[in-house]
Regions:
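Signal-peptide-cleaved, periplasmic/extracellular N-terminal interaction regions immediately downstream
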Residues: 2-5, 24-148
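Bacterial N-terminal signal peptides that target proteins for export
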Residues: 2-14
Length: 148
């Protein structure tokens, strides 16, 4: 009887080890996310034309956003829910201009990932938002007098 138990012990032990290994492998692969599933902010660019100073937030897909104008500190706060930053500078100082002081990008990871961009303004300018397939264009009007 002891001999038959000894003969069964090694196959049972080997089976337990293999099942444990298989369970670990399947758990790890279930948690993997591909980059294609994530919304990313890939760049922040500033430009100017005769009428506007333009901040362009580029993404790998169409970006969902909420924009709130702030008085203290003066600027525009733009939140991008379920969107991460993709290796971009977190603080940007544009070339000398009459509109923008700086642009700061942060990634918040409370209750999911949200990216926040704060555009610090020198004066209270009117603005407009124009989303497209690759991001968001924010136009600060130069031709209007600063908002009061």
């Amino acid at each position: 009887m002891i001999d038959s138990i000894k003969k069964l012990f090694k196959p049972v032990q080997l089976s337990i080890i293999l099942l444990s290994f298989a369970a670990c492998v399947s758990q790890n692969t279930a948690n993997v996310k591909t980059v294609g599933e994530s919304k990313l902010i890939t760049d922040i660019i500033t430009s100017e034309d005769a009428q506007s100073t333009i901040v362009t937030v580029k993404g790998n897909v169409t970006l969902t956003y909420t924009a709130i104008k702030q008085e203290l500190p003066l600027g525009l706060l733009v939140d991008f829910p379920e969107t991460a930053l993709d290796n971009i500078k977190t603080v940007y100082y544009p070339p000398e201009n009459d509109t923008l002081n700086s642009i700061r990008a942060t990634q918040l990871e409370e209750e999911g990932v949200t990216s926040r961009i704060f555009i610090s303004l020198k004066q209270d300018f009117s603005y407009s938002l124009q989303p497209d397939d690759t991001g968001l264009h924010i136009y600060f009007s130069k031709t209007d007098s600063p908002a009061v």
